[in-house]
Regions:
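Eukaryotic intrinsically disordered, low-complexity regulatory tails and linkers enriched
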Residues: 1-48, 213-215
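Alpha-helical solenoid scaffolds in large eukaryotic transport, assembly, and signaling factors
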Residues: 36-215
Length: 215
């Protein structure tokens, strides 16, 4: 788990405010405090600890499933578990391992897997953490490199008369992929950080070309 692990509790609505509540420490240091006042405090801390332990167990169980799926090269199950957990720390680590740091020649994602990944990428893109934002656009850049020529060719090739259900299904999925890329392009976070990362500028340059070709 990375260094942002504890920050992520707020992302999961897990507020650990009892650790920073000055009133609690004032009460604990007050020798004249009525013992009856300690009981709600203990109950509150026990409840928070219980939530913490449950969240930890959920994360560990999820990581086991993801790790097992990766060992078996079962990308679909790994992506599904990442999406189910909605844990940005785990998603960030998974995308770094499976997409960004991997040789692009060794990456294969089918249409359905890409579509399942994009909601997670969009969540990371809008995160307040810079490293999550960077992971998001780098992952999107990898997917763009994998798919841009395939989608452009499919969208621009001459229409063949007759019904081709397989082609129509692919085009519908390609349209959804294009829509996700468009949502990334108009993101206020992307506009705000445009001059911060050279790689982001390169990504946007290729993305603009791709979106123009797909109109």
């Amino acid at each position: 788990m990375n260094k942002n692990f504890y920050n992520n509790f707020n992302d999961n609505n897990m507020e650990l405010d009892f650790l920073t509540n000055d009133n609690i420490y004032d009460n604990m240091n007050n020798n004249n405090v009525n013992n009856s006042l300690d009981i709600p405090l203990i109950d509150e801390m026990s409840e928070k600890n219980d939530k913490f332990c449950k969240l930890m167990k959920k994360r560990i169980d999820g990581l086991k499933i993801i790790a097992s799926s990766c060992r078996k090269n079962n990308t679909e199950d790994a992506i599904a578990e990442v999406g189910y957990l909605k844990d940005l720390g785990i998603a960030n680590d998974y995308l770094n391992y499976s997409l960004i740091k991997k040789d692009i020649k060794l990456i294969y994602l089918n249409n359905d897997e890409v579509l399942k990944l994009f909601p997670t990428i969009l969540l990371l893109l809008e995160s307040k953490y810079d490293n999550y934002f960077k992971t998001a656009f780098q992952s999107a850049f990898v997917i763009l490199k994998l798919y841009q020529n395939i989608i452009i060719d499919a969208k621009t090739c001459a229409f063949v008369s007759g019904v081709d259900l397989n082609r129509e299904d692919k085009l519908k999925k390609y349209d959804k992929i294009i829509d996700f890329f468009y949502r990334i392009r108009i993101s206020s976070k992307v506009a705000k950080n445009m001059n911060k990362y050279l790689e982001l500028q390169n990504f946007l340059s290729e993305l603009d070309y791709f979106l123009k070709k797909c109109k």
